Structures are given as C-alpha cells and as structure tokens.
Curated annotation (Swiss-Prot):
One of its GO terms (molecular function) is L-cysteine desulfhydrase activity. Belongs to the UPF0597 family. HAMAP family: UPF0597 (MF_01845). Pfam families: SDH_alpha. It comes from Salmonella paratyphi B (strain ATCC BAA-1250 / SPB7). GO terms for biological process: L-cysteine catabolic process to pyruvate. This is UPF0597 protein YhaM.
Length: 436
C-alpha cells in the first residue's frame, strides 16, 4: 500500500505521532495510577479489599486536584480505587472507560472506609513513577509503572515475580520512533506534511473527532471552571466579539473544561497529556473551518501541529515545571499558520513569538485551572500567527528568543530541563503544604 512509497524518515514521523497521539480518558497522571491498580487487581482471584500506592512527586502534583471521570471526586486515591475495582488493565490510558456505577460506588466506599493510602515514593529518581499494591485476603499483587504513563516495568505477587522489564532504556530509545526527533528539524517536518500521501495520515482526523466532541460537551455543561460556556455567554451579552479569535478561545477552553471537570469522554492526547492534545487540535480545527478546509487539508494541518508539538516536547522532561500547553500551542501555531499561507517563515516566526510570550508559564499540577492556561496558550498562538502573517515576530535580540527558531526552542527547553527543576520542587512543596 502507501507505506512502500514513503521514505524511512516520513514513516518514522508517522510512527512517532501514532506513539504519542492516543485516546485517553481522564487526566493521564491519576490514570497512570489507576492502570497500575487495575493491572495489579487482574493478578488476584478475589475482590480487592485494600490498596497501598506510591507515586513520584511530579505525579502527586498532577494528581492532587483533578477530577477522575465518572466519580465527581478529585485526587489519586479515587483513581487507584476505581482502577482496582472497575478498571480494564488492557485498555491503557482508557483504563476507566467501562467502569460501572457499582464500581464507582464500591470505590467511594473503599475510600470512606480508609482502605486506600497514596504516599510519596521516597527517594525517587523517576519523574513519572506509580506503584499500586492491592490486597485480597492473604493475597497481594503489586504493579510498578515508570517513565511513561503506561510503561509497566514490574508485576509481583505474594507468589513471586510475574514480570520484570529488563533495564535496557538505551536500547529502547534507539528503537523508539521518537528517536528520529533528536536529529530532524521543523523544515523537514513541514516538507513531510506537504508531500506525504493523505491516506498515510488520515488517522489524525480522529483527534478532531474526539477533541471536537469534548469541546461540544464543554459548551453544553458546567464542567470545571466552565470557561468556554461562560465566555460564550459574554458574547451573547455583547462583551466579547463573535469572531475567529474568540471562537478559538471559547472552543479550546470548553474542551479542557470538560476534560478536567471529569467528563466521561476521551481526549486525543499528545505526549501523554489530554490538554496538550486538545491544545494542538482545537485551534487548528476552528481555523480550518473558517477557511473552508477539506479533510485532507485539515489532516495535514493537524499532523503539522501534533508532530511539531511532539518535536518540541521531546526536548523536555516528561513532566516538569513548564506548562506544556504552551509547547502544544506552538504546534497549533504552526498548524494555523500553515492553513493561512503555508510558508515556513510564517511558522517559524509564530513559534518564536510564542516563546517570547508564554514561555514562563508554570505547571502547578493538573486541575480545573488548566483550562485557563490552555485558553491563554491558544490565544497566544493565534496572536503569534497574526503577527507572523504581517512579517512581525519577537526577534533574536530579545530575551531567550534566538535568531534561529530551532535555537529558540532549545533555549526554552533548557530552562525546563535545568533551572526550572528548582521551581518544580518549590511548587510541589507549596502544594504539599496545602494538603496538610
């Protein structure tokens, strides 16, 4: 089929997107713990009666304040309990998609009885770490996830070790389709998007379907901070213009509202995050509708957005003090700019302006307020595109922005990888003090 006509670099790009753009039900950090609990429960014959769990500081940060779908409750304990009692260990990031009302009730009862404990893993050298140990009578099972939200590295029961992943991280990185991102460029990504056969990337339209449905749900309900529906009301009151800029803001916010507020609809994630997937998708969809783009043009714009976002995020830690909605919005800026005029220079200028604008936004854990940051990032992306269309951008004479967009990206990512590590520790310390 078309695969035989695609050069190896392009095939790697496609595999990278398929690896990083996946459906996910619920915020992915608590879902990672839910998956560990579900996988552990699957090793037992009896009903789970008690759960002990341990997570990394970053996973604790991103799990403390977010609503778990279908429960109306926030936090890691309910995620662990529902994963153990109603999760599907084979469903990955959609582990809770088939959880029944009875499972939700049983999970809440387990919490009320004080039978769920979630603790910090100390010491912990892994940014993303979740471990769930579940008990049934005299039997127990323990599952550990490290490095990626679904990467199970060890399964152990009271009868012995069932599975352990060999410590071959370097070999895995070498074989990963993401490895190509360390020696490519935005120009090569744009060349791929312009020329790859449509059938090879048609799958990315699922991102528009899933995240578009979340956006509609967010506008219908009072999810989270209901930013999208609130701003829509202000349009009706004449306080906001009903224009393209506002549509980007409202529809993107609404999807994140529903996502963070616990709607039982999956998001198409990017780089392990539903909000990043929403940010890379919805602004591009709105502009595509505005310009009357057909499915092929929308797919190419979405592929550019998602792959650019992955390319930038690949240079970051999986979780950090930098709000990655900003880097996902840089992908959206690329996709929107491509839809308007398709020039590389416009795309590069838009991303440079984004780095000069929202690069200092911190991640202080997953919560309803993520929708605020998603809306800010989406608006900044469109502003940067409008400037670039007039050949205006933040230049290499200003701040951390360099004369070359690739160096600008590297400068931003170096902040997250180095100096913002202390920021992350301070954020976690502040959040932990609130929990006591």
């Amino acid at each position: 089929m078309f695969e035989s006509k695609i050069n190896p670099l392009w095939q790697s790009f496609i595999l990278a997107v398929q690896e990083e753009v996946k459906p996910a039900l619920g915020c992915t950090e608590p879902i990672s713990l839910a998956l560990a609990a579900a996988a552990a429960a699957a090793e037992l014959d009896g009903t789970v009666e008690r759960i002990d769990a341990w997570v990394s500081p970053n996973l604790m940060k991103n799990g403390m304040g977010v609503t778990v779908p279908g429960t109306g409750m926030v936090g890691l304990p309910i995620a662990a309990a529902l994963g153990a009692l109603g999760g599907d260990a084979k469903a990955g990031l959609e582990v809770l998609k088939d959880a029944s009302a009875k499972a939700v009730a049983d999970a809440k009862a387990m919490l009320a009885a004080g039978h769920v404990a979630v603790m910090l893993q100390e010491p912990c050298n892994d940014i993303l770490f979740s471990r769930a140990k579940v008990y049934s009578g005299d039997s127990w099972a323990c599952v550990t996830i490290v490095g990626d939200h679904t990467n199970i590295v060890r399964i152990e029961t009271d009868k012995g070790v069932v599975f352990t992943q060999a410590d071959n991280a370097q070999e895995e990185e070498k074989n990963s389709p993401l490895g190509v991102l360390s020696h490519t460029s935005l120009e090569e990504i744009l060349a791929f998007v312009n020329a790859v056969p449509f059938d090879a990337i048609r799958f990315i339209l699922d991102a528009a379907r899933l995240n578009g449905a979340l956006s509609q749900e967010g506008l219908r309900g009072s999810w989270g901070l209901h930013i999208g529906s609130t701003l829509a009301k202000q349009c009706d009151r004449g306080l906001l213009a009903k224009d393209l800029s506002t549509a980007i803001l409202i529809r993107t916010s609404a999807a994140s509202d529903a996502r963070m507020g616990g709607a039982t609809l999956p998001a198409m994630s990017n780089s392990g995050s539903g909000n990043q997937g929403i940010t890379a998708t919805v602004p591009v969809m709105v502009v595509a509708e505005h310009v009357g783009a057909d499915d092929e043009r929308l797919a190419r714009a979405l592929m550019l957005s998602h792959l650019s976002a992955i390319y930038i995020h690949y240079q970051l830690p999986r979780l950090s003090a930098l709000c990655a909605a900003t880097t996902a919005a840089m992908g959206a800026a690329a996709g929107m700019a491509w839809l308007i005029d398709g020039r590389y220079d416009t795309i590069a200028m838009a991303i440079s302006s984004m780095i000069g604008d929202v690069s200092g936004m911190i991640c202080d854990g997953a919560s309803n307020s993520c929708a605020m940051k998603v809306s800010t990032s989406a608006s900044a992306a469109w502003k940067a595109v409008l400037m670039a269309l007039d050949d205006t951008a933040v230049t290499g004479n200003e701040g951390i922005v360099a004369h070359n967009v690739e160096q600008s990206i590297a400068n931003l990512c170096s902040l997250a990888c180095r100096s913002m590590q202390q920021t992350d520790k301070q954020i976690i310390e502040i959040m932990a003090s609130k929990a006591h």
